[in-house]
Amino acid sequence: MKSRLEIKYKDQIVPELFKELNYKSIMQVPKIQKIVINMGIGDATTDPKKLDAAIFELEKLSGQKPIVTKAKKSLAVFKLREGMAIGAKVTLRGKKMYDFLDKLINVALPRVRDFRGVSKTSFDGFGNFTTGIKEQIIFPEVDYDKVIRLRGMDITIVTSAKTNKEAFALLQKIGMPFEK
């Protein structure tokens, strides 16, 4: 069964973007390819239990098992050695991607205190959008009473758009709340 957002994309957004951006083929219309959620846990070098808690929370909100990210280089300033676990990330595609994006736009972001919209300047020049979230408790799956420490995360939405303008138009039609 398809996600509500996926149905909206195929039936409504694709024809609108096709006309709006003057494409010659329907295959040129940009689409979301994947969403990458990254949680960096700096405390994981001293206490591995903090990494386990972050992995559990990331698994709850994404619906799939995250992979542990490891340090590429040793840094004495942070007491970090090459190969030490320092975070977790998960890559979402398909139905889980659309479900997560729907939840992010309609449930999680409106729960952020003093939320005025996500930044319009968070595009990378190649049609990808990255935003940071300061607290994981804005997601309904994360139980506030079981949270040991508030952690932020980076959410990257990778699109097939060639330019920032195309990616902005796509995300705006999907319902991403951009700041005015």
Curated annotation (Swiss-Prot):
GO terms for molecular function: rRNA binding; structural constituent of ribosome; tRNA binding. Keywords: Ribonucleoprotein, Ribosomal protein, RNA-binding, rRNA-binding, tRNA-binding. One of its GO terms (biological process) is translation. The keyword Ribosomal protein applies. It comes from the Bacteria. GO terms for cellular component: ribonucleoprotein complex; ribosome. The keyword RNA-binding applies. It holds the Pfam family Ribosomal_L5_C. Gene3D superfamilies: 3.30.1440.10. InterPro entries: Ribosomal_uL5, Ribosomal_uL5_bac-type, Ribosomal_uL5_C, Ribosomal_uL5_CS, Ribosomal_uL5_dom_sf, Ribosomal_uL5_N. Disulfide bonds: none annotated. This is one of the proteins that bind and probably mediate the attachment of the 5S RNA into the large ribosomal subunit, where it forms part of the central protuberance. In the 70S ribosome it contacts protein S13 of the 30S subunit (bridge B1b), connecting the 2 subunits; this bridge is implicated in subunit movement. Contacts the P site tRNA; the 5S rRNA and some of its associated proteins might help stabilize positioning of ribosome-bound tRNAs. Belongs to the universal ribosomal protein uL5 family. PANTHER family: 60S RIBOSOMAL PROTEIN L11-RELATED. Part of the 50S ribosomal subunit; part of the 5S rRNA/L5/L18/L25 subcomplex. Contacts the 5S rRNA and the P site tRNA. Forms a bridge to the 30S subunit in the 70S ribosome. This is Large ribosomal subunit protein uL5. It comes from Mycoplasma capricolum subsp. capricolum (strain California kid / ATCC 27343 / NCTC 10154). The lineage of its organism: Bacteria, Bacillati, Mycoplasmatota, Mollicutes, Mycoplasmataceae. The gene is rplE.
